[in-house]
Amino acid sequence: MQFLDDSLLPENQEKLVITVAPYGPEWEPADFPEDIPVTMEAQVQKAVDCYNAGATVLHLHVRELDGKGSKRLSKFNELIAGVRAAVPDMIIQVGGSISFSPEDDGAAAKWLSDDTRHMLADLDPKPDQVTIAVSTIQMNVMEILSESDVAGTSFNRPAVANAYREMTVPAGPGWVEEHLRRLQKAGIQPHFQLANIAHLETVERMVRRGVYTGPLNLTWVALGGGFDGPSPYNMMEFVRRVPDGACLTLETLMRNVLPVNAMAMAMGLHPRCGIEDTLWGRKGEKMGSVQQIEQLVRIARELGREVASGKEAREIYKIGTSYRDADDTLAHLGWAPNRAHGQRGVPLRRAA
């Protein structure tokens, strides 16, 4: 992404799109009973409260009445329908793992099977987005967590901690390409969750081959444990490599969330918050998803950055848009065109 002399001025930046992940499938309700919704009614109301606070993208997982993460797509359909009726302008982004939480102590923390995750393209009503990983990778979320991060939570139990230490993301090339085909056919926009620059390069290669032809909404996911860590050096190199036509959100864990989000907002990028990412405000003080959104809105106001409405967020994300082919997609995203047969030198960009 390019930064001009006036790129840090808020009047030249996109309006702020706040993503919230308020369902926290990794946590047990007892970890934060004041903020973890369990009933379907409470889960819908949580979306409403987050939208009213200023979040316009809802990262959605679902819980069963016993408090465990739901692996039933019928429950996803029910929650999507409830949220759509209550806050129709909110962008509904379904977490592509469905649920990675272990069933019981000693069970693995794992994503559901390839075929089951493909069924996200058949959700009804359909969401606006489904998140997608583009490479199989270790997802050891325990690696950068401190004792204070997990104090008083289920992550203090060795079996739970070990399950998340050993978690991997299954996303082989064949599955990724088939998943993108199904999502695009269904009119659902993929939201790429990328762990590092290697994953960004994989996305670019898929665009160049015409595997994906649409707007590029990305999240840089700085979790450590196989992913980039939340170092500003990692962040800035990733930002540098993202094409100008993409929309970039930053994500990390626990008390790194606020400083990373503050940098995102100052640079004209977009933040993500919510209890899936952090339970904490100041050290030792829990902060719920709505309060995290309100904090970001306050910071945005101090920066002079306007917060997008639901309809404006849909325009920024280009929900419902697709492009003709690889060349058209490359032009819209600001990547150099594919090399023509026999062409030497650097292919020059053209206007979209």
Label every PLM stretch briefly:
Residues L8-D35, D149-P158, N162:
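N-terminal small/glycine-rich loop or linker at the start of catalytic domains
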Residues P22-Q45, G96-S113, R165-P170, H191, ...:
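Active-site mouth loops of central-metabolism enzymes
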Residues E41, F76-P170:
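Active-site beta->alpha loop and helix N-cap motifs at the rims of alpha/beta catalytic domains
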Residues Q43, C50, H61, V130, ...:
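Conserved, mostly hydrophobic/aromatic
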Residues T56-N77, W220-G224, L279-K283:
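Glycine-rich, proline-tolerant flexible connector loops at the mouths of alpha/beta enzymes
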Residues K68-G96, H179, L183-K185, E237-G245, ...:
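Alpha-helix-loop-beta-strand connector modules within alpha/beta enzyme cores
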Residues Q129-E276, K286-M287, Q291:
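Catalytic alpha/beta core domains of metabolic enzymes, predominantly
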Residues E201, M236-R240, P259-A352:
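Structured C-terminal cap/extension of enzyme domains
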